[in-house]
Amino acid sequence: MKHTHRILLAAFVPLCFTAVGAQTTPMVEQFTLANGLTVIVKPDRRSPTAAHMLWVRVGSIDEVDGTSGVAHVLEHMLFKGTATTKPGEFSRRVAALGGRDNAFTSRDATGYYQQIPSDTLEDVMRLEADRFANNQWVDDEFKREIEVVKEERRSRTQASPIALMLEAATGLTFTASPYRRPIVGWMSDLDAMTAQDVRNFYQRWYVPGNAAVVVSGDVEVAEVRRLAVTYYGPIAARPVPVRKPQDEPVQAGPRRMDFKGVASQAYVNLAFKVPKLQAADFAGDEQGRDAVALTVLASVLDGFSGARLARALEQGDSRLADRTSAYNGLMGRGPQLFVLSGVPAPGKTAAQVAAGLRQQIALIAQEGISDEELNRVKVQWVASETYKLDSVFYQARQLGSNWINGLPLDADTRLLSKLRSITSAEVQRVAAKYFGDDQMTVATLVPQPIDPKLTPRVAPALPTRHSIDHD
C-alpha cells in the first residue's frame, strides 16, 4: 500500500525546509489579538494568491464518551449559516470571489480554509470571522446534516472490512487515550446526537483563545494585522476550557485481535507505541531524536520505490505479500504509533506476513542500514518538502499544524537540522528498542465468504465537501 503510506507520512512529517535559500526566506510573523486569538502570517509574493485558514484546537481527542463524532458534525454545521448568511451561502460567496473552500476534522484539530485571489482576503476574513463567532442554524438543518454524516460513516467505514478492522484495532491499542474513538463517531452516538449537543460543543471550544488564523501568500503583514483586528478583534474573549490529562498507561503485554469480515484477502496490521516529538524537543538537536530516527526508519522500509519491504516481501514468485506499508506517527496531541501492515500473497498467511514485517525490523536492529539508504531518505525528504513550498496552502497548513502542537515558528528549520544529523547507528538503535512484544498490538482481518443471498450494498454518492483527517 505504497500510495497510502506516502500520504500518511506527509501528514505526520511537518514542514522540513523553509526556503530554497535562506536569504530569500519570507519572515513568518505571529501576534495575538486582545481577545486571545493567534494570527500567523507568511508572505509569499510569487503569485497573486493567498490561503486563509482558521484552526481550532479541538478534535475528536476532546470529545467525551457518548458524543463521539461531534467535532466532525460541528465542522459540517459551520457551513449552515449565521444571522447574515444562509445555509450554503458561505461557499457560494467564496466561489464568486474566484476562490475555493473546504474544511477537515482530525483527532487533534478542526480546520477551515479558503484558497483565494489575494485581493479578496478582506471579504474572506469578514465571512470567516462571522462564521466562527456567530454560527447558528435551525434544528431541521441539523437533522438533515446528521444523516449526511451517518451515510459518510456507512460508505467509508462500515462498507470497508479493513476500515472496520482498523477502527476496532485502534480501540484495542488505546485504553485511556481519547484516540481510541473514531473521528467520524460511533453510529450509536450519531443516532443519539442532538442539535443541542453540537451547539454546546461549539460554545465550549470555539473561543478566540483556542483558535488561530493563518494567512500565507501575496499579503502584507501590516494589512493582515489590520484586517484581523477589524474582523476577528471584536469577538468576545472567553475562557479556554481546562483539559484534564488522559495519559495512556504503559502497555504490559501484546494485544491481538482477529476480525472477521467479508473480504477476498486477509490483512494484518501491527502497531507499536513509540515516542513522539513534543514542543520541548525543539530546544536543541539532542532532544526528540528517537522520534525522528523512527520516521527515518519508516522511510527506509517504505519511503521510496524499491525500499526494503517491497524488495524483501513483495517481489518474486515466492513473495510473502501483495502489498506492505510502514509509517511512523511523528507528532500529535495524543500518543503515537509506528505501524507495519501487509496483504498476504496467494498461498501465504497473515501470520507469515506479520513475521516477515518484523523480520525486516530485526534485520535493521542487527545489521543497521547503509549510508546510501540514509542519504536517500534525507535527500528525498528535503526535496519533497521543498517542492511543496510552491503551494501557499501547504505553507499555511503546516504553520497551523505546528501551532496546534504548540511548536515554535521555526519548527520546520529545527526539524530539518535534526533530520540531517540522524545517524545510521540511531536508526539501528530505535529498531532494536521499540519493537518488542509488550508494546505491540496485532490485528488480523480474517476473510469471510460473501453470502450469495445478500445483495451487495452500493453506497450513494456523497458530497465532496468536508473531510476527515485520519492521522
Q: Language-model features: where?
A:
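Bacterial N-terminal signal peptides that target proteins for export
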Residues: 1-9
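Bacterial N-terminal signal peptides
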Residues: 8-18
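Boundary at the C-terminal end of the N-terminal hydrophobic targeting segment
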Residues: 20-24
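M16 family metallopeptidases and their MPP-like homologs
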Residues: 42, 47-73, 87-131, 161-188, ...
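Active-site His/Glu-centered metal-binding helix of metallohydrolases
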Residues: 70-78, 297
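Short, polar/flexible loop-turn hinges at active-site or ligand-entry regions and domain interfaces
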Residues: 80-85, 132-140, 369-370
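Non-catalytic, conformational "gating/processing" segments within enzyme and secreted inhibitor domains
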Residues: 146, 195-231, 439
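An aromatic/glycine/proline-enriched structural segment found at the starts
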Residues: 175, 183, 212-278, 388-389, ...
